[in-house]
A protein has these predicted regions:
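Membrane-embedded alpha-helical bundles of multi-pass integral membrane proteins
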Residues: 2-272, 319, 332-369
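Cysteine-centered iron-sulfur cluster-binding motifs in ferredoxin-type domains/subunits
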Residues: 127-142, 234-249, 278-326
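Asparagine-centered strand-capping/turn motif at beta-strand->loop junctions
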Residues: 414-418
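Short acidic, flexible loop segments centered on an aromatic residue
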Residues: 419-434
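Intrinsically disordered, low-complexity Pro/Gly/Ser/Thr-rich segments with frequent PxxP/GP/PP motifs
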Residues: 439-468
Length: 503
C-alpha cells in the first residue's frame, strides 16, 4: 500500500472527518493574527477551487473586465479621414484623448481629473456600503492573480495536487508542469503588456511594428516593464501585493461604519466549534464543524473566523465554501455571510437589525458624486471649441519707438478644436488710442485662418502714441484681446496688460 501524503490523508481519512461525509482540511491560516510577523518569511498559499454564487460572480466579473481590457484597443470608431479611428486612444503625440465620440484635448485635463475624483468617491461609497468589494472582484491585482491561479490549476491540479507537486523531488513531471505554468504566465503577461501599449497608438499598426521590429524603442521598453510587472505581481507576489504594497487596506477602516456590509463569521451561531459525529445532536454546540473549508479557499490565507482582518479582500469565497458544508450537514446557510458590524457585535439571541442604506456617510459620498458629475456636465455643455492664450513679451516688457510711442508685443495662440477650418478676427480694447498690427498681415483686423484640429500662433503688436501715454493707468493698463469667429460670431475674450514706463 502506497503511503499517502499527509495533506491528502487529512482530507480523505475517516479519522479526520469534521462531520459524516465531510473531510476536515488540514490547512493553516497563513495570514492569521497569531502568525502575523513583520519579519516572517512568506508561506505559499494554495487556494482551493470554490463553487457557488460568489465564485460565479467572480468568474463573470473576471471575464468582463479582461474582455474589456484586451478588446477595447481593437474597437474602431469612424471620426473622419484625418483623425484616428481607434475607439479609445490616448494620443500623446497630438495631446488628445479619444473615447468614442468624445475628444478631450490637453487643455481640458480637468475632465480627466473629474473622472478620477468620481472614481475615488465611487470607491469610497462602495466601501462604505459593502466593504472592499472592489478589491475582491474588480481590482486588477485580484483579476490577474485569479487568472494566474486558473492557469496554475489547469497545469498542476487543485490544492492538494499543487502541494504534493511542490513537496516532491524534481522529476520530469514536475519540471514540465512548472515550465508549462510559468510559460503560460509569461504569455499572459506579454499579452497584457502588449495590449497596454496599444492604448497609446493605433493597435493594428503598432502590433505589426512590434512583430517586424519597427516599433519605437519606447514601446518595447514599456511593454517589457508591463510584462515583467504582470508576471511578478500576478503570478509570483499575489497576496503580498495586497498585504504589503497596497495602501487601501489601511485606508478602508476610515470608510466603514456600523452599517457597512462585510463578509463575517457569525460566532454566536458557530461557537463552540468542533467536529460533529454521526448521531450527535446539535444542541449545546455551534454549527461550525471546524472543517476549515473557509480557510482552504481563501486566496489571502486568512481564517475569517478570527474576525475582521486587514488581509481580507471581501471576495466571499469563504461564504460559498461554508454554505456548501452547511448544505451537506443539513444546517441553515449563512454561518459566514455579508452582515453589518452592529449585527456581528450584537449579543447572541438579539434581533438582527435591518440594513440602513440611507445614512450620513452614504449620503455624503453620494452627494459629492452628484455634485462633481453636475459640474462636469455643466463644464461639458459650456465647453468652447476655441482656446485662446495670450503671452506678453517679457524681455523687454515694452519698446520705445523713434516717434516716442510705446509698443508691447504679444504672442496669441489660437486652438481650433473642431474638424473644420475656421477664420477669426482680432480685436483690441481698453486703450484710449492705439495702433495694432499682426506680423504677416496687412491689417490688424485681417481674417486669420486656423486649420482643423490645430494650433496657430501669431505675433501681435500694440502701440500707444505719445499724446495718449498720459492717459494710461500707471505702468500696467488693462488690455482686452478678443477673437471672433467670422462664420458664427463666437467670441473669446482674454485679459492682459499694456506695459509702459513705470512697470
Amino acid at each position: 500500500m502506497t503511503q499517502m501524503e499527509p495533506q491528502a490523508r487529512m482530507e480523505t481519512g475517516a479519522a479526520t472527518e469534521a462531520a459524516p461525509g465531510v473531510a476536515r482540511i488540514d490547512v493553516e491560516a497563513v495570514s492569521s493574527k497569531s502568525s502575523r510577523s513583520l519579519y516572517a518569511g512568506r508561506k505559499k498559499i494554495y487556494p482551493k477551487l470554490a463553487h457557488g454564487t460568489f465564485r460565479s460572480v467572480k468568474w463573470l466579473v473576471m471575464a468582463v473586465t479582461l474582455g474589456i481590457y484586451y478588446l477595447l484597443p481593437w474597437l474602431r470608431w469612424d471620426r473622419g479621414p484625418t483623425l484616428p479611428d481607434q475607439a479609445f486612444l490616448l494620443d500623446f503625440a497630438n495631446q488628445r484623448l479619444y473615447f468614442g465620440p468624445i475628444e478631450i484635448w490637453a487643455q481640458e485635463l480637468y475632465f480627466i481629473t473629474g473622472v478620477l475624483v468620481l472614481s475615488a468617491l465611487g470607491l469610497f461609497l462602495v466601501t462604505a456600503l459593502a466593504g472592499r468589494m472592489w478589491c475582491g472582484y474588480a481590482c486588477p491585482q485580484t483579476v490577474w492573480t485569479d487568472l494566474m491561479i486558473v492557469v496554475e490549476r489547469f497545469w498542476q491540479g487543485d490544492r492538494n495536487a499543487r502541494m504534493k507537486l511542490d513537496k516532491s523531488h524534481w522529476t520530469f513531471e514536475k519540471i514540465w508542469k512548472k515550465t508549462a505554468t510559468h510559460l503560460s504566465w509569461l504569455l499572459i503577461a506579454l499579452a497584457t503588456g502588449g495590449v497596454l501599449v496599444f492604448y497609446f497608438r493605433d493597435a493594428p499598426t503598432l502590433a505589426m511594428e512590434l512583430v517586424t521590429g519597427e516599433a519605437p524603442a519606447v514601446a518595447y521598453v514599456f511593454m517589457g516593464i508591463f510584462t515583467f510587472s504582470t508576471y511578478l505581481l500576478g503570478g509570483i507576489a499575489r497576496e503580498q501585493v495586497c498585504i504589503y504594497m497596497c495602501p487601501w487596506p489601511r485606508i478602508q477602516a476610515a470608510m466603514y461604519d456600523q452599517d457597512s456590509l462585510l463578509v463575517s463569521y457569525h460566532g454566536h451561531r458557530g461557537e463552540p466549534r468542533g467536529p460533529h459525529k454521526k448521531g450527535q445532536t446539535w444542541e449545546d454546540r455551534g454549527d461550525c464543524i471546524d472543517c476549515k473549508a473557509c480557510v482552504a479557499v481563501c486566496p489571502m490565507g486568512i481564517d475569517i473566523r478570527d474576525g475582521q482582518q486587514l488581509e481580507c479582500i471581501q471576495c466571499a469565497l469563504c461564504i460559498d465554501a461554508c454554505d456548501d458544508i452547511m448544505t451537506k450537514v443539513d444546517r441553515p446557510l449563512g454561518l459566514i455571510g455579508y452582515d453589518t458590524f452592529q449585527n456581528i457585535e450584537a449579543p447572541a439571541g438579539s434581533p438582527r437589525k435591518p440594513l440602513r442604506l440611507v445614512r450620513p456617510r452614504v449620503m455624503l459620498y453620494s452627494g459629492l458624486m452628484v455634485l462633481v458629475a453636475a459640474l462636469m456636465l455643466w463644464a461639458w455643455m459650456m465647453r468652447s471649441t476655441i482656446e485662446i492664450s495670450v503671452i506678453p513679451d517679457r524681455n523687454p516688457l515694452f519698446v520705445v519707438l523713434s516717434d516716442g510711442s510705446i509698443r508691447n508685443g504679444y504672442t496669441l495662440k489660437i486652438l481650433n478644436k473642431t474638424h473644420d477650418e475656421r477664420t477669426f478676427r482680432l480685436g483690441v480694447e481698453g486703450l484710449p488710442a492705439f495702433q495694432a498690427s499682426i506680423v504677416g498681415f496687412d491689417q490688424a483686423d485681417a481674417p486669420v485662418a486656423v486649420e482643423p484640429d490645430s494650433l496657430r500662433a501669431i505675433k501681435v503688436y500694440v502701440s500707444v502714441p505719445p499724446p495718449a501715454l498720459a492717459k494710461l493707468a500707471g505702468g500696467a493698463t488693462p488690455l482686452t484681446l478678443t477673437v471672433t469667429d467670422v462664420e458664427n460670431g463666437d467670441v473669446v475674450i482674454r485679459d492682459t496688460a499694456f506695459r509702459s514706463p513705470g512697470s
